[in-house]
């Protein structure tokens, strides 16, 4: 409703009929016909993605008054945190685009050795992983992986195409704890502060599409089924 209010008052100068004629559709009612506008909204938060669809009708005698009718609302347990996990795993850690995997390969390690190092430090809990190791893994993700990916997402939002980024640039305001740095250096055999983190917008977009494609396909079907005239995307990941 805030969206409609701002658009009608700021852009259309309260010319409600013209706005509804452009974006809305005519429907039949008991008293004849009227023009309605169906607005779908997707709010991608950290933990859930919330979908709402609402139909609006206006009164020709009082065009400033809109009658909202909610017709669909639901939440999906896939959102920004899930996308962030995919980006960290596929861009920072492992795979064809994994920066750490590339750094380990420069040491002349075989694929099995690289996988073992990455799994021992970042993988799921296993019987060789001590409580201290689990805490270090958690702290590394919170103090290193997440800040780097947020930095990448900000570069993407700013329209940056390609950059190599130093440790000092990313952690200029707050550095990871020395315990985390020392544990990483010991386990990986790499100096964390010497790594050049390569930002590539094409790689970012590829993995964002991979992470969100399934969710967006399902939501697109819902929006189409309810014949949405306008679709709004909100939330930080958008």
Feature annotation, model-predicted:
Residues 53-188:
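Phosphate-binding glycine-rich/basic clefts of nucleotide- and phosphate-handling proteins
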Residues 184-223:
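Adenine-nucleotide phosphate-binding core of ATP-dependent small-molecule kinases
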Residues 1-13, 81, 85-89, 210, ...:
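Glycine-rich phosphate-binding/hydrolytic loop that grips phosphoryl groups
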Residues 25-30, 37-41, 72-77, 217-223, ...:
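Generic recognition of flexible, low-complexity loop/linker segments
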Residues 1-39:
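Nucleotide/phosphate-binding catalytic cleft detector across ATP-hydrolyzing
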């Amino acid at each position: 409703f805030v969206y409609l209010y701002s658009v009608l008052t700021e852009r259309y100068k309260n010319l409600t009929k013209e706005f509804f004629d452009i974006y809305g559709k005519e429907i039949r009612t008991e008293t004849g016909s009227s023009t309605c506008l169906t607005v779908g909204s997707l709010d991608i938060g950290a933990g859930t993605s919330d979908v709402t669809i609402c139909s609006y009708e206006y009164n020709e005698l009082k065009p400033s008054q809109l009658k909202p009718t909610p017709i669909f609302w639901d939440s999906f347990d896939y959102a920004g945190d899930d996308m962030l996990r995919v980006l960290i795993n596929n861009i920072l850690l492992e795979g064809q685009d994994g920066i750490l995997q590339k750094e380990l390969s420069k040491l002349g390690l075989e694929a099995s050795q690289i996988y073992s190092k990455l799994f021992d430090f970042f993988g799921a809990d296993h019987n060789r992983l001590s409580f201290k190791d689990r805490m270090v893994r958690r702290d590394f993700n919170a103090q290193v992986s997440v800040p780097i990916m947020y930095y990448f997402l900000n570069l993407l939002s700013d329209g940056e195409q390609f950059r190599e980024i130093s440790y000092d640039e990313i952690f200029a305001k707050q550095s990871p704890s020395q315990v985390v740095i020392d544990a990483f250096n010991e386990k990986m055999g790499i100096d964390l502060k010497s790594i050049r983190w390569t930002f590539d917008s094409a790689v970012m977009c590829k993995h964002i599409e991979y992470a969100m494609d399934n969710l967006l396909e399902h939501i697109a079907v819902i929006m189409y089924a309810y014949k949405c005239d306008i679709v709004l995307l909100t939330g930080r990941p958008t």
